[in-house]
Amino acid sequence: WIGVRGAASALYLHRQGIENVVPIGCPTMYSNFAGEILPSGIESPRDIAVPFHWSIAVNLLDELCDHRLIGQDVMDEELFLENKSARLSRNISEHLGISKNEAQSKLEYAVSSGGFFPESYQAWYQEIGNQKALLSGRLHAAICGLTQGVPTVLSSWDIRTREIVDYFKIPSASGEQIRKEGSLSAFMNADFEGFNERQNVCWGRWSEFLNQNNIANNSKVYDSSVGPFWNFKTELQNDNEILKTASYLKSENKSGQSRQINRALRVLKRGLKSTVRKTRL
């Protein structure tokens, strides 16, 4: 069996003639089971740290200085440690239609006020885990927050993050929502209940995926009530058949998104929702 992020990736591989491909999400999500996560005690933007990415900086620019900003990649390193903001300021100014000087001034002030760039992966991971809450523009920062039990909302901005949000039901907020409502409102309106309900199902699918591949597995389904009500082997097989069937359907327009494929994907999503309902029994 081959495991991929989500249904769109699985469908793409099926259409290339590759069989036994199923969605399992990101393996990093199975590094630690944190249990139920609730956004309690979040009272102001200062309670919410932001793993930095330019796309989220765009939507938080006017309140960016109210947040703890956590850098991650080489572009962040240039900004946080060397004060080289020209490239990011240009991106932000073009996106918002403001002057580069205004974007640069707000960006540099926010980073100087609350920016943190780690010396190592361990320092970065610890910093993520030490936060009261996270509004993340970074996928793996969000994952490492959730696996450490930190209430986390992910701002998805590409197919990669969208697939992970859909599969795990990660609490999420759109860039437009963050820009219009502000970080606190966007955070508090995110769906943590859906994520909490989905966790045991994802872990059950992961456990069965490893079992099907004869890979040693130290993880388990953390809610024992899941097992009697759902056969995860059958679920993986059903997903595989649905995606295989969908891969035979031809595109009906230039974008390659046919009505039949969309219907097949909706069927798959309904199956995932059905799994969640069964875990409630």
Regions found by a protein language model. Give the residues of each.
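Active-site anion-handling motifs in enzyme catalytic cores
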Residues: 1-281
